[in-house]
């Protein structure tokens, strides 16, 4: 076995004993004074003469160099000097006649230790093994520790780390952006026999927009000195170059799938569970790939009609329902089940029309889940409904029904669903929904984040602290600050949403135009769903304010076009009116802390927000929709950050250099193709060794970026506040319908043990600038194996880092006979979960 092998050789067993702890005490070293050659080679202590060729050393680049024992003496001597002089500069570092600045006794120790190292190296060389530089350094470190000079050994370890840092590889493109694009968003092209490449995906999306606005492409956009067609061309080029991103749902579904179902354009939505139709509509939205926020506050759920008393199942008239093989069919099955408890019938479902598991979904892409996920969900929902007859539904029951519906989507639908449940702060059942051993009896509750509503003008600090302490202890429930209990948010809480309206004459006319069939009077309040429409600016590209403003205009242009897709007949006319009257945008910035000199400048942020608002107003006029009420936000950007090669949203890079790990099933075609080009970047995932591997990508933060270690929790929250004040608030164009409602800066705060109290005080005192805050206790990234993010710190980390040289993958050569895309793997609006892929 060669010295460079990683197996448990005698050399590595001995070298493992030299690992330094913080106080420089070696672990499991032989007794002080032991001649270490007797540990390594007990059969011989004598140096055996070998030829010069045999004693050549393997350098780091693989070349051979002459064996020079005096370099060993010098390296050990410099470590002694550093330990004795607390790291001071050594004026004699190159002067052997001055013993490298050491005393006679220390120099004698140096020669003795060097002799043992030389003997050991030459013994290995005599056996035909050519040692590497790192292996010789391991021996030096071990011999110093074995001689009892622990302070010198630590100095030598630090010296090695410093030299390794100077030699660390500079990786260019790591491959993560293209891998994520191909594995998570690329559509299968049957005509090409492969998945589309990123430029082809961008073209597909913008051809959809050109088709929709075909009659307007030559129209000059007021104030822009360009036609709409030219602005679309500019936007496509920016997306192709990854300077900006559209809605990632549009990248996933753009084309026929969105034209058939406009809900697929939108990342997320929010609604009140105040009408029996909301259950089936929520399922339809989840099946469309939309993240769903919902309110089960008491004032909303109480609007559901009470359930009549119910006879036993065998005494009820049976109603048969054959479930159509569409997302509308699945949602209708939910509606039939809930309504059967109002109508006094027992519904039996026929699943025979649902395609078999694995069948190709030609419009939306991916593969059919089969009928089992829906069947299981409906039976469990029936169990919840069986307990209700004779009274009104409780919020916890409405919540569980929706979570069981979400589990059907997660098990086999288009994508993993993302949900947030907002509830009344005094609802003890919802407060305690995830306490005790809830996962044993109510595992469906894992599919949501839960937050209590705190109206800013009414909430007390005691209420807030009760929730804050629950987050610290259990992780949930969270808190949600609002101006009005009828407002809400998407699952990541960066979009302010108001899914109800007060009817006026204009609204009533619109409702009639869109076919609203119910009687409604001026002054009535009715509810539906409000959607959020997101785009992203690549912060790393914003080297100057001017470039930032340019990308603001691009992102606002894309978002405004996306806001025109409002036909969702399954949700009804109320939802369409709600969405069209405010035509929301969510222009986000990904990688704010990559360019803090630009993107934390209040004046630059304000001008950028104004650019977004003005561009939206101009493009909206050109395409005939309302200008947006709210335009700017900051979303978590978990997956987008990987596509763009930036830190996520407003969050800092994990470190200057770190490993970013992405899980991949061994059956995934894209993963296997990537591995064939870059096997050195893949390894078995220890938690799922039978089925899953991980890819380790090397990530390096740009010069000038703010890193995780550079800021504490309060400094980070202050940055969130600054961006909210100067980017989000100026991006609020009007408050005509929903006073005080704002978009937000989605953020996750890492809190050290001594920071919790000050963080609570800061959030409470500045609650006008915060809506929801995710709180995570600080922990080390080496606390468990194969962490999603791991800083490069140790010499072995550097060796691994230097070995992660990426060979660019030509995905155009990846051939697939059929569509094996797995769009359910893509998560939108999933908060912290975005970091774990």
Describe each PLM feature range.
Residues 2-837:
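Extended catalytic cores of very large enzyme megasubunits
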């Amino acid at each position: 076995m060669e010295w460079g092998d990683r197996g448990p050789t005698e050399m590595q067993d001995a070298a493992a004993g030299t690992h330094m702890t913080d106080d420089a005490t070696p672990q499991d070293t032989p007794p002080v004074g032991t001649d270490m050659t007797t540990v390594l080679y007990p059969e011989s202590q004598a140096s055996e003469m070998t030829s010069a060729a045999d004693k050549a050393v393997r350098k780091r680049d693989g070349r051979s160099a002459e064996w020079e024992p005096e370099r060993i003496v010098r390296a050990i001597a410099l470590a002694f000097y550093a330990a004795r002089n607390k790291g001071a500069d050594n004026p004699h570092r190159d002067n052997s006649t001055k013993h490298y600045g050491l005393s006679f006794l220390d120099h004698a120790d140096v020669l003795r230790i060097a002799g043992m190292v030389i003997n050991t190296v030459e013994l290995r060389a005599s056996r035909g093994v050519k040692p590497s530089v790192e292996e010789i350094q391991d021996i030096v470190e071990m011999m110093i520790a074995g001689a009892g000079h622990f302070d010198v050994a630590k100095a030598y370890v630090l010296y090695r780390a410093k030299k390794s840092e100077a030699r660390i590889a500079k990786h260019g493109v790591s491959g993560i952006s293209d891998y994520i694009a191909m594995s998570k968003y690329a559509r299968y092209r049957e005509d090409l026999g492969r998945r589309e490449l990123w430029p082809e995906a961008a073209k597909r999306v913008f051809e959809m927009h050109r088709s929709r606005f075909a009659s307007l492409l030559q129209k000059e956009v007021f104030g822009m000195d360009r036609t709409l067609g030219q602005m679309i061309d500019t936007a496509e080029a920016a997306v192709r170059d990854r300077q900006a991103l559209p809605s990632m749902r549009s990248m996933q579904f753009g084309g026929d799938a969105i034209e058939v179902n406009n809900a697929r354009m939108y990342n997320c939505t929010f609604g009140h569970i105040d009408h029996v139709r909301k259950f089936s509509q929520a399922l339809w939205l989840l099946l469309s790939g939309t993240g769903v926020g919902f309110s089960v506050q008491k004032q909303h759920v109480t609007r559901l009609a009470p359930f009549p008393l119910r006879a036993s199942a065998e005494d009820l008239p049976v109603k048969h329902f054959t479930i159509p093989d569409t997302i509308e069919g699945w949602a209708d099955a939910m509606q039939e089940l809930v309504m059967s408890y109002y109508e006094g019938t027992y519904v039996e479902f026929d699943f025979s029309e649902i395609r078999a598991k694995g069948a190709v979904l030609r419009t939306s892409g991916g593969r059919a889940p089969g009928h089992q996920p829906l069947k299981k969900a409906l039976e469990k929902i029936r169990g919840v409904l069986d307990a209700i007859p004779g009274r009104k539904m409780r919020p916890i029951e409405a919540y569980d029904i929706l979570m069981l519906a979400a589990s059907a989507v997660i098990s086999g639908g288009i994508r993993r669903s993302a949900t947030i449940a907002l509830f009344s702060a005094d609802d003890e059942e919802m407060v305690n929904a995830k306490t005790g051993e809830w996962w044993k009896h109510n595992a469906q509750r894992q599919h949501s984040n839960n937050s209590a509503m705190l109206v800013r003008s009414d909430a007390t600090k005691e209420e807030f602290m009760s929730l804050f302490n629950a987050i610290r202890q259990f992780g949930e429930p969270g808190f949600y600050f609002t101006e009005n209990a009828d407002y809400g948010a998407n699952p990541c809480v960066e979009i302010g949403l108001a899914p109800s309206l007060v009817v006026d004459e204009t609204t009533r006319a619109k409702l009639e135009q869109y076919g609203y069939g119910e009687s409604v009077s001026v002054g009535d309040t009715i509810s539906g769903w409000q959607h959020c429409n997101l785009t992203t600016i690549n912060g790393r590209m914003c080297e100057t304010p001017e470039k930032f403003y340019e990308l603001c205009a691009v992102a606002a242009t894309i978002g405004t076009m996306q806001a025109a897709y409002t036909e969702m007949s399954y949700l009804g006319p109320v939802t369409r009116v709600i969405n069209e009257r405010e035509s929301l945008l969510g222009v986000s910035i990904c990688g704010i802390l990559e360019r803090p000199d630009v993107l934390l400048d209040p004046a630059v942020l304000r001008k950028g927000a104004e650019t977004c608002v003005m561009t939206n107003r101009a493009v909206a006029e050109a395409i005939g929709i309302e200008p947006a009420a709210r335009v700017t936000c900051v979303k978590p950007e978990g997956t987008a950050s990987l596509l763009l090669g930036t830190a996520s949203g407003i969050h800092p890079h994990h470190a200057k250099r770190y490993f970013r790990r992405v899980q991949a099933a061994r059956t995934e075609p894209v993963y296997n193709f990537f591995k064939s080009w870059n096997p050195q970047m893949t390894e078995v995932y220890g938690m799922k060794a039978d089925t899953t591997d991980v890819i380790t990508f090397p990530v390096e933060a740009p010069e000038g970026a703010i890193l995780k270690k550079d800021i504490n929790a309060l400094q980070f929250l202050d940055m969130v506040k600054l961006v909210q004040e100067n980017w989000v608030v100026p991006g609020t164009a009007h408050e005509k319908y929903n006073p005080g409602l704002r978009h937000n800066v989605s953020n996750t705060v890492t809190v050290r043990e001594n920071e919790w109290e000050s963080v609570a005080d800061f959030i409470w005192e500045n609650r006008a600038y915060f809506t929801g805050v995710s709180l995570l206790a600080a922990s080390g990234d080496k606390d468990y194996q194969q962490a999603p993010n791991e800083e490069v710190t140790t010499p072995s980390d550097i060796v691994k880092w230097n070995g992660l040289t990426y060979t660019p993958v030509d995905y155009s050569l990846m051939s697939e006979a059929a569509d094996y895309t797995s769009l359910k793997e893509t998560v939108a609006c999933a908060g912290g979960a975005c970091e774990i892929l």
